[in-house]
From Swiss-Prot:
Its EC number is 4.6.1.12. It comes from Xylella fastidiosa (strain 9a5c). This is 2-C-methyl-D-erythritol 2,4-cyclodiphosphate synthase. It catalyses: 4-CDP-2-C-methyl-D-erythritol 2-phosphate = 2-C-methyl-D-erythritol 2,4-cyclic diphosphate + CMP. It comes from the Bacteria. Its cofactor is a divalent metal cation. Keywords: Isoprene biosynthesis, Lyase, Metal-binding. 4-CDP-2-C-methyl-D-erythritol 2-phosphate binds at D22, V23, H24, H48, S49, D70, I71, G72, T146, T147, S148, E149, F153, R156. GO terms for biological process: isopentenyl diphosphate biosynthetic process, methylerythritol 4-phosphate pathway; terpenoid biosynthetic process. GO terms for molecular function: 2-C-methyl-D-erythritol 2,4-cyclodiphosphate synthase activity; metal ion binding. Homotrimer. CDD domains: MECDP_synthase.
Length: 176
């Protein structure tokens, strides 16, 4: 059984998993974008686009599951078109890529890693917004937060990060 798949490209599977990570340093501003939601904060983030770490990590997770590189390859920071761009544009692009390849989003599990801002009051809006972008039900999207317990650049309040896992599926080759 161990040699059953040796030398074969596993393209016939009906499930794929992708993982994404993004990080941004804090900078001037009065809010951060997280999961497509404007969250008031003592500062903004240093980024070429709107710097939404959750949506950027979501893009990388989808692109990774599809084997299509990363967000920087699709939306290079050197391209002036993406200066200050709404990260929802990036998510819609990645979602279109997966739909064109007959994949659907099964679920999204996102974790924001930050000492501040506190995101609990905004989680439902994030879940609903991400669900709309991906054309899934909000219960298919989890958004939560954790801290780094005061350790590292996040613990010192210098920035924030996010990790996202996405499950893609095909239902007997039929797109739903």
């Amino acid at each position: 059984m161990s040699g059953l798949f040796r030398g074969r490209v596993m393209t016939g599977l009906n499930v794929r998993i992708g993982q994404g990570y993004d990080v941004h340093a804090f900078g001037p501003g009065d809010h951060v974008m997280l999961g497509g939601v404007r969250v008031p904060h003592r500062c903004g983030v240093l980024a070429h686009s709107d710097g939404d770490v959750i949506l950027h990590a979501l893009c990388d997770a989808m692109l990774g599951a599809l084997g299509l590189g990363d967000i920087g390859q699709h939306f290079p920071p050197s391209d002036v078109r993406w200066k200050g761009a709404d990260s929802g544009v990036f998510v819609r692009h990645c979602h279109l890529l997966l739909r064109e390849r007959d994949w659907c989003v099964g679920n999204v599990d996102a974790t924001a890693i930050c000492e501040s801002p506190k995101i609990a009051p905004y989680v439902n809006a994030m879940r609903e917004g991400i669900a709309r972008l991906l054309e899934v039900q909000p219960e298919c999207v989890s958004v939560k937060a954790t801290t780094s317990e005061g350790l590292g650049f996040i613990g010192r309040g210098e920035g924030l990060a996010a990790q996202v896992v996405v499950l893609l599926y095909r239902l007997n080759g039929v797109v739903v």
